[in-house]
């Protein structure tokens, strides 16, 4: 049964070495009718980077800067969740969105928690979001939904728009900790894939979402770059040059891999060979088993044009 949800420092040296030398198990992602996935990608027990005492001290300092007494603070490892909705609602987001996403992402992709204790600020509406982002962080949000700020060690969300952006942004600090050299296309491709997600066979699963129509228009107009070009984009190129198409192409490449049982396998292959394959392009060719990537792009475009939003 498919369960859908709209969910728009010290470490002992030996343990550190074990994590740094770790290579992910290259088993494939599981979908109905495809190969099963191992219960966990990690070959060793995850290391607890921060202690209960670390979280307690963090929360004590955090409470000193709360904008008002109307905020609830919940420790949800590896994050601390802060929200100005009723306490039971904040706890619900913490358990059913944050914990769920963390558990599922770690199940298939990530062995390590983020490098720092990060705060997730869940503001109840656009007024609270804009006001408190300015008051707490000295900046006006560039998006009405939410964003991750590594500078402020925080995910800053307008939770009234739904939990999809929250799950998207949770991906980024995990990428930072586990795959620092990850190129923008995969970082944002994975993040945006899970903007609308649920579970299939107990694993996180992305569904077609609002990015689809724009990508389909770009395909029909012949404006989608080659996969070699997409994967080679640096941050400036990805975020500043035709940003919408880049996000859409990255998301639906990840979606295609997911639907063919190849996404987790690709991630682990790329992770294991990142020094020799900095863009992931060669790993992509290997996992697809395709030499002619121009022919694959045409096949992929036909596939994307058959998709419908919300299916």
Describe the function of each predicted region.
Residues 44, 51, 58, 63-183, ...:
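Juxtacatalytic substrate-recognition/specificity segment
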Residues 52-53, 162-163, 238, 255:
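Short, flexible segments with low predicted structural confidence
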